[in-house]
Amino acid sequence: MTRLRRGCVLAVVGAAFIAPAVAQELCGRPSESPEALFDRLTKTEKLKEDFRDKSYVAISDKSKETVWTFTVPGHPAHPSVVCRRPVQDGDNLRLDTNVRCNAAEAECEKLVKAFQELNHRMMQELKKQQDSKKQQTK
């Protein structure tokens, strides 16, 4: 596994691959601190929260088909942000995921792993739904 460093930006493609991001962007936006990005998305761009619990807050940018998930104070990987967006790759759909984690290396690794697992479950569920629709059309 690629070693993570404090303040690093990672690109996670699909559900299993991790590599350091080369560009200074996060899902097509200039890379900035999670706090600054949250403020820009919610205050300047007026995007609404879709979900909030004791660990995360999620915001959807429907125009860019991107979901932004921010850790909240008290989360071990705080301050961090994860952005995910679907990408059609031929007949396959995958989730491109980027992570900016400003926590300790071990906590960043846990955060990345948690989102990899979530992405994997989401893709399995999506595949089941697609297979079910194919069966219904036969």
Description of each model-found segment:
Residues 1-11:
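Bacterial N-terminal signal peptides that target proteins for export
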Residues 18-20:
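N-terminal signal peptide c-region/cleavage motif recognized by signal peptidases
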Residues 23-78:
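N-terminal secretory signal peptides
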